[in-house]
C-alpha cells in the first residue's frame, strides 16, 4: 500500500511559517535571522538563498497574510453567492474571530505599527493592502444597497482595529467580546438609512401684508398719539 503521508514542507515554507510565528510572539525587530533559521530547521545560508534579506522575508510573510485574507473573501462569496448583505455579516463574524484570537493582534496591523519608516520595503505593501481591503469592503457595502458605503466601510474598519487593541489591553472578555453585536448594529443603522427617509415638507404661505413687530407697533401708536397732541 502506497504511503499517502503528506510531503514535509519545503525549506522556504518552513522559514516563512516559523518567521510569522516568531514575529507574532516577539515582534519583527525582536527576533533575528539566526533564530528563525535554527527554529525552521535550516541555516542562515539557506534563508538568504530564498530571501535576500530579513526585510524580504518580512514582505514574504505579509504576502502570505494577504493570500489568507483573499481566501477569506472567496469563502464569503462561496458561502453566500449573490447575497452581499449576508457576505457583509460574514465579514463581521470573521472579524470577531480575528479580534478575539490569541491576543497578539493581526500580523499586518502589527507590522504597520512596528515598521513606521516610510522607506521600509514592507511599508508600501502594507499601505496598498490596507487600501485595497478598505475599497473592497466599500464595494461590498454598495452591493448591499448601503447609501453611504464608504462611511460604513470606514466605520467597520475602525471598529475592527479598535477591537484588536481592546483584546490586547482588556482581554477576551472586554469590549471586543461584543464585536458582532456592535458590528451588526452599525450595519443595520446604515441599512435603514439606505431606504431613504422622507424629508419634512414645508408649506409656503401665501404672500400677505407684512406683520409689524409688536414693540414697533406700540412705538408707532405712541408716536401717532404724540403728533395728535401736538396739533
Task: Show the residue positions of the predicted features.
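Hydrophobic alpha-helical connector segments
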Residues: 60, 74-104, 143, 153-156, ...
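Amphipathic, non-transmembrane alpha-helical scaffold segments
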Residues: 8, 16, 62, 66, ...
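Amphipathic C-terminal alpha-helical segment
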Residues: 98, 157-175, 186-195
Amino acid at each position: 500500500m502506497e504511503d499517502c503521508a503528506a510531503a514535509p514542507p519545503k525549506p522556504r515554507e518552513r522559514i516563512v511559517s516559523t518567521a510569522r510565528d516568531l514575529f507574532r510572539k516577539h515582534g519583527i525587530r525582536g527576533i533575528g535571522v539566526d533564530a528563525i533559521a535554527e527554529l525552521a530547521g535550516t541555516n542562515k545560508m539557506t534563508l538568504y538563498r530564498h530571501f535576500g534579506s530579513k526585510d524580504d522575508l518580512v514582505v514574504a510573510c505579509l504576502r502570505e497574510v494577504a493570500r489568507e485574507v483573499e481566501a477569506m473573501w472567496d469563502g464569503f462569496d462561496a458561502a453566500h453567492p449573490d447575497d452581499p448583505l449576508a457576505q457583509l455579516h460574514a465579514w463581521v463574524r470573521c472579524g470577531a474571530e480575528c479580534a478575539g484570537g490569541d491576543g497578539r493582534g493581526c500580523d499586518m496591523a502589527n507590522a504597520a505599527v512596528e515598521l513606521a519608516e516610510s522607506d521600509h520595503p514592507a511599508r508600501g505593501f502594507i499601505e496598498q493592502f490596507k487600501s485595497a481591503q478598505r475599497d473592497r469592503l466599500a464595494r461590498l457595502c454598495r452591493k448591499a444597497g448601503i447609501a453611504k458605503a464608504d462611511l460604513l466601510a470606514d466605520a467597520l474598519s475602525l471598529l475592527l482595529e479598535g477591537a484588536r487593541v481592546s483584546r490586547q489591553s482588556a482581554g477576551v472578555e472586554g469590549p471586543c467580546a461584543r464585536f458582532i453585536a456592535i458590528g451588526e448594529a452599525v450595519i443595520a443603522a446604515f441599512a435603514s438609512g439606505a431606504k431613504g427617509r422622507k424629508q419634512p415638507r414645508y408649506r409656503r404661505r401665501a404672500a400677505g401684508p407684512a406683520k409689524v413687530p409688536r414693540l414697533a407697533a406700540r412705538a408707532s401708536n405712541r408716536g401717532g398719539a404724540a403728533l395728535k397732541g401736538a396739533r
